[in-house]
């Protein structure tokens, strides 16, 4: 049974948001260059000072709505300071996953990071360790063979401010995700550390529905908690069918969840996650990017149920409205088109995360101000919209939902 004392409690996308984890953009953003943007999954380089102001505005908007804001970087520092052995193990693992499992470069990086105060060490790991920050003896074969045209020994993590993706809260537990691309794969190590060692979360019987030690990819932007027993997952560029099956199997075996809806979307950079094209904004209202639907309003869907033998029963469909109404017990359903359905406007505003709303209560959402047509469409459908400035933070291809990891929501009235 779920309890009010559980540090993680998320049974919907729309229940009043009580606690969220954010990451304030840091020096990792300024370590992007034109040559590294592509591998690090960016299309442009945000102006850090303005990006920080915009992010602070986002955090303040949440606080004014009664949301407790926790910062990932502070949680990581607090977790590391609980035990020197935990800190040493984390450093060793982070260096190994940065490409140096052993050898003199590993040893030099370890010496460098251990010598920093914990808060500076965490900032440095997130920002990246440059080649010229470490003394490497050229006579050593590993050092001699290292490609010195690479600016970083440990690459920066500029996507960290999208805290949604490395993990996802579901019920009284979470998934800690195996990220798709190497540029983001280390990010879920921070979640793993915090859940296992931070006093707020450690030894609190939090269910980990799927950990990061898998090959099949899974990202939180594809995981949408539609109710206390229904989960939607995007089959996308960033989440595989194998991972969806894993999550369904584990939820069916250990939770109240009995339905997983797999929604297939185009596997492109613009539509990397389900929440870039589809989000829940009220009990019976959803945003949807019209491009993912064919001219009949259809797209491929698989509905997975737990049968009486605890096996997975799969049904196929192509009607999003019908599936949502049936699985959520709704008589009516309102799909609100990004860009108010205009093909040019919807494409432009979806690129700038017009579909990526963060619900802070039923019928109340946070959005980017730049998507003014989509915002007005939401208002026409009775949704309360709180807009935040977004000229720089939007350059990372993520919106308010992407930038937030809810860990506690109030249950919604049935």
UniProtKB/Swiss-Prot annotation:
Active site, per annotation: 402
Main location, first listed in the record: cytoplasm
GO CC terms: cytoplasm
EC number: 3.5.3.6
UniProt KW Nucleus keyword: no
Protein's UniProt keywords contain Nucleotide-binding: no
InterPro entries cross-referenced by the UniProt entry: Arg_deiminase
A GO term for molecular function: arginine deiminase activity
Enzyme class: hydrolase
Listed Pfam families: ADI (PF02274)
Record GO biological process: arginine catabolic process to ornithine; arginine deiminase pathway
Keyword annotations from UniProtKB, A to Z: Arginine metabolism, Cytoplasm, Hydrolase
Pathway: Amino-acid degradation; L-arginine degradation via ADI pathway; carbamoyl phosphate from L-arginine: step 1/2
Taxonomic superkingdom: Bacteria
Gene3D superfamilies noted in UniProt: Arginine deiminase, L-arginine/glycine Amidinotransferase, Chain A
Family: Belongs to the arginine deiminase family.
The protein's name: Arginine deiminase
Native organism: Oenococcus oeni (strain ATCC BAA-331 / PSU-1)
Gene for this chain: arcA
């Amino acid at each position: 049974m779920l309890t009010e004392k559980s540090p993680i409690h998320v049974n919907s996308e729309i229940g009043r948001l009580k606690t969220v984890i954010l990451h304030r953009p840091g020096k990792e953003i300024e370590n992007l260059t034109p040559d590294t943007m592509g591998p690090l999954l960016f299309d442009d380089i945000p102006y850090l000072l303005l990006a920080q102001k915009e992010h602070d505005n986002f955090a303040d908007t949440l606080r004014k709505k009664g949301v407790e804001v926790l910062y990932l970087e502070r949680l990581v520092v607090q977790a590391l300071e609980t035990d020197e052995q935990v800190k040493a193990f984390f450093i060793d693992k982070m260096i190994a996953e940065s490409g140096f499992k052993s050898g003199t470069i590993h040893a030099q990086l370890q010496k460098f990071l251990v010598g920093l105060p914990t808060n500076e060490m965490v900032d440095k790991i997130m920002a990246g360790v440059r080649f010229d920050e470490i003394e490497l003896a050229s006579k050593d074969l590993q050092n001699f063979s290292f490609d010195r045209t690479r600016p970083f020994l440990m690459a920066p993590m500029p996507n960290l401010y999208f805290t949604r993706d490395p993990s996802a809260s579901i019920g009284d537990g979470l998934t800690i995700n195996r990220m798709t691309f190497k540029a983001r794969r280390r990010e879920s190590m921070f979640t793993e550390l915090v859940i296992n060692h931070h006093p707020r979360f450690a030894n609190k019987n939090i269910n980990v529905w799927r950990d990061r030690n898998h090959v099949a990819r899974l990202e939180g932007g594809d995981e949408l908690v539609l109710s206390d027993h229904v989960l939607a997952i995007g089959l996308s560029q960033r989440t595989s069918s194998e991972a969806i099956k894993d999550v369904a199997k584990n939820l069916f075996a250990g939770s109240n969840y009995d339905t997983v809806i797999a929604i297939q979307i185009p596997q492109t950079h613009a539509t990397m996650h389900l929440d870039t094209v589809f989000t829940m904004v009220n009990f019976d209202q959803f945003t949807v990017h019209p491009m993912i639907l064919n001219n009949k309003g259809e797209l491929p869907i698989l509905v997975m149920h737990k049968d009486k033998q605890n096996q997975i029963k799969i049904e196929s469909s192509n009607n999003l409205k019908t599936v949502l109404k049936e699985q959520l017990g709704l008589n009516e359903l309102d799909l609100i088109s990004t860009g108010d359905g205009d093909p040019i406007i919807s494409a432009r505003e979806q690129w700038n995360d017009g579909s990526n709303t963060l619900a802070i209560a039923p019928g109340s959402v946070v959005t980017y101000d730049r998507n003014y047509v989509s915002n007005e469409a939401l208002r026409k459908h009775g949704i309360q919209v709180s807009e935040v400035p977004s000229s720089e933070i939007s350059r990372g291809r993520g919106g308010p939902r992407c930038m937030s990891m809810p860990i506690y929501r109030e249950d919604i009235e049935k």
